[in-house]
Amino acid sequence: MSRRALRRLRGEQRGQEPLGPGALHFDLRDDDDAEEEGPKRELGVRRPGGAGKEGVRVNNRFELINIDDLEDDPVVNGERSGCALTDAVAPGNKGRGQRGNTESKTDGDDTETVPSEQSHASGKLRKKKKKQKNKKSSTGEASENGLEDIDRILERIEDSTGLNRPGPAPLSSRKHVLYVEHRHLNPDTELKRYFGARAILGEQRPRQRQRVYPKCTWLTTPKSTWPRYSKPGLSMRLLESKKGLSFFAFEHSEEYQQAQHKFLVAVESMEPNNIVVLLQTSPYHVDSLLQLSDACRFQEDQEMARDLVERALYSMECAFHPLFSLTSGACRLDYRRPENRSFYLALYKQMSFLEKRGCPRTALEYCKLILSLEPDEDPLCMLLLIDHLALRARNYEYLIRLFQEWEAHRNLSQLPNFAFSVPLAYFLLSQQTDLPECEQSSARQKASLLIQQALTMFPGVLLPLLESCSVRPDASVSSHRFFGPNAEISQPPALSQLVNLYLGRSHFLWKEPATMSWLEENVHEVLQAVDAGDPAVEACENRRKVLYQRAPRNIHRHVILSEIKEAVAALPPDVTTQSVMGFDPLPPSDTIYSYVRPERLSPISHGNTIALFFRSLLPNYTMEGERPEEGVAGGLNRNQGLNRLMLAVRDMMANFHLNDLEAPHEDDAEGEGEWD
């Protein structure tokens, strides 16, 4: 209730005159409009005190509570909507309102002026609302002009500095394919869809006292059991921005570099407790968290291993540059910089945990994120995994779209995993009942065409795939020269790595009876084409000999991270003989170092006897333990030292021969008989 209505209720405008129940009149206009009108016009019901004001008859004082709402009701055709008037009347006073209306009808001439006066009042209200709208529109236009001016200023600043906010690339194909959705980075989103929100959030009870409000992050959710976060000296810098792409790099402060040196010493000791001691002083050192996570995983402590990886991701996300975006697909991190590799490995380990946890949709989003950081080089070779995650997440449309957009410039059909996963995606898509019949038949035909091309290009995949699925092939297939055992043996070693990697990871996707029957039909079609002398068969054989001579380093790195036994066993000797560190597997040969680890002087007497013996075989061995030259060229890292050591051992063993043992004399025959 307004103050003006209270004054009228108390009768202050008419002095101390008593008020009757049917003699109250109230103006629906403001005081300013009342002053502009000049002389007042009389309504049909006069005030007992003198000249009356135009208004609305009120028979109950409690109607004043809702009388102010009448001013905001719309006016249509000069009349106010009837719902507002009815709402202003209390339910218990409907009879009074009706009696008041009947009394007003019997007043004669006074009642004839009521409609015209009401239309006049509604016209005044309409004019007032138009004025208010004009004022609002003028202020809105002014604010929009101000925002446009601000945008122009920001654009000029960005053009002058050359630092543009990372946005979509000019070629939108990669942007759309590698676009990451924030909500799919949270595994709870997928688990809620499977089990319901109550099952996932049932144990999470909010605490009202001593609540901690951590920084909002997308990759992980901080836990109350973690140490208090303080900046560990890790930051991110924007290197350059060109062609719609922004290149970033992590940086280590001097304090973080000291912690990194201590970490390398702890790794060389081969004692996990030394890493635990380091984490007590530096609880958010990323490499220590990742290395200790591997140690916990080897000891079957999966929960602790996953928690350590999440803490490493949280530490790196808190160090993000303000312009670094996880979802745009236009931010790049160079894997040649050692500071950036920790982020790659942390994302990969988190993706592996999510897949084992039963969240393939979330793992697919992490896979796209890793691929978007450096899609051209693909240092972790995520193209060997993304098809598997898309099939497990039943996101067949995404896999087909990725194949269609990247086949022209990446030759995805030359990878066995894409050659077999894409037709499988088409076939599974054709099995969906919600698709129209024409689309189902089209997808089925496309699937059959692609699987026949895959079997022609990679015939050595069929028999190992059937064996992994516990399916016995027909005699006509297993005994044929094209799909027989010779097909698997004759393929190059690099191709064997890719085939073993795909079968060890995705063979269970082919176990469905409908899938096996469809595969069997197309196998017989391929055999008919081979027997008919199709020239495509010979062309594929020549292509296999040329393309798969040696696998690149990123594929070897991916095989090591996958930990698939069949694929690891197929690695070449030059990779298996190298020392592989969990925090940096197979570093690039063209590494860009921002700082060099200082060489340490260790007393010779404190070393292991066998290690000292092998070290003494090196040509640059000295008893005093002299310091090598400073700088990147002179200071050799641990991996290079181990490589030299292994080469020296191999050379020694190659030149080491045992003399032929002399034949035993006849006199010693009785002595040897005692061992029988």
From Swiss-Prot:
Localisation: Nucleus; Cytoplasm, Cytosol
UniProt key word Repeat: no
GO molecular function: DNA binding
Pfam families: Tcf25
Tissue expression summary: In the embryo, widely expressed with highest levels in brain. In the adult, highest expression is found in the heart. Repressed in cardiac tissue of patients with heart failure (at protein level). mRNA levels in the heart are unchanged in patients with heart failure.
InterPro entries: TCF25/Rqc1 (IPR006994), TPR-like_helical_dom_sf (IPR011990)
GO terms for cellular component: cytosol; nucleus; RQC complex
One of the GO biological process terms: rescue of stalled ribosome
Role summary: Component of the ribosome quality control complex (RQC), a ribosome-associated complex that mediates ubiquitination and extraction of incompletely synthesized nascent chains for proteasomal degradation. In the RQC complex, required to promote formation of 'Lys-48'-linked polyubiquitin chains during ubiquitination of incompletely synthesized proteins by LTN1. May negatively regulate the calcineurin-NFAT signaling cascade by suppressing the activity of transcription factor NFATC4. May play a role in cell death control.
PANTHER family: NULP1-RELATED, RIBOSOME QUALITY CONTROL COMPLEX SUBUNIT TCF25
Assembly with partners or alone: Component of the ribosome quality control complex (RQC), composed of the E3 ubiquitin ligase LTN1, TCF25 and NEMF associated with the 60S ribosomal subunit. Interacts (via C-terminus) with NFATC4; the interaction leads to suppresson of NFATC4 transcription factor activity and is reduced following stimulation with angiotensin-2. Interacts with XIAP.
Similarity comment: family membership: Belongs to the TCF25 family.
Protein name (record): Ribosome quality control complex subunit TCF25
Primary gene name: TCF25
